[in-house]
Amino acid sequence: MDMTAAQVHELYKLRVDIFVHEQESPYKEIDDTDIHPGTQHLLAYETEGGVHLIGTARVFGKPDEGQHIGRVCVAKDARGHGIATQLVKKALEVCTERAAGIDPNKGALIELDAQSHLVDWYERFGFVVDGEEFEEAGRPHKHMSMRI
C-alpha cells in the first residue's frame, strides 16, 4: 500500500514525538528504510473525535535473508490498550506471509532491536535475546530474533 502525503506526515510526526522528543533521543528519524520498496508500514488509527494515527510499526528485509520489525510505537495517550501488541502481531503475520516460499525446515528469521526494558514484552511473542546489550540513540538495546 502506498501511503498518502498526509499519512507520511502523521507517521513521521508520531515517531519524532515519541523517539526524539519523549525519549530525548537525537535519532535520525527519517531514514532510507522507510522509502525502500520492500518496507511495509503498519498504521493504527483512533477514530473517536476524528481519525488520527496513534501507532505504527514497520517490517523490512528479505524473507530469505531475515526480516526486521522496527520503529514500533504508540502515542502516549493511547498506551495501555493493547495497540502495540496488535501492531507486533500484525507485523509477525506480514513476516509469515512474506516467508511463505521459504523452506519450512530452515524457517524464516525475524529480527528486532528492542529497547532493553522491553525485552520481556517481546519474549511473549517468541523472540529471544541473541546478543549483548548495545546503545542506540542513547538508549540500551538488545538484539532479538525468532524463526517462523
List each model region and its residues.
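Short hydrophobic/aromatic beta-strand element in the GNAT-like acyltransferase core
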Residues: P26-K28, T39-A44, T56, R71, ...
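Conserved acetyl-CoA-binding loop-helix of GNAT-fold acetyltransferases
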Residues: V74, G80-T96
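A conserved beta-turn-beta hairpin within the catalytic core of GNAT-like acetyltransferases
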Residues: G61-G70, R79, K106, A137-H141
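Conserved beta-strand in the GNAT
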Residues: L43, G50-G61, E65-C73
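Conserved GNAT acetyl-CoA-binding A-motif
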Residues: C95-Q115
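Methionine-biased hydrophobic packing positions in alpha-helices, especially
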Residues: M3, V72, L87-V88, M144-M146
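Short amphipathic alpha-helix that is part of the acyltransferase structural core
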Residues: M1-H41, Y45-H52
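Conserved catalytic-core motifs of GNAT/GCN5-like acyltransferases
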Residues: E111-D113, E123, V128-H143
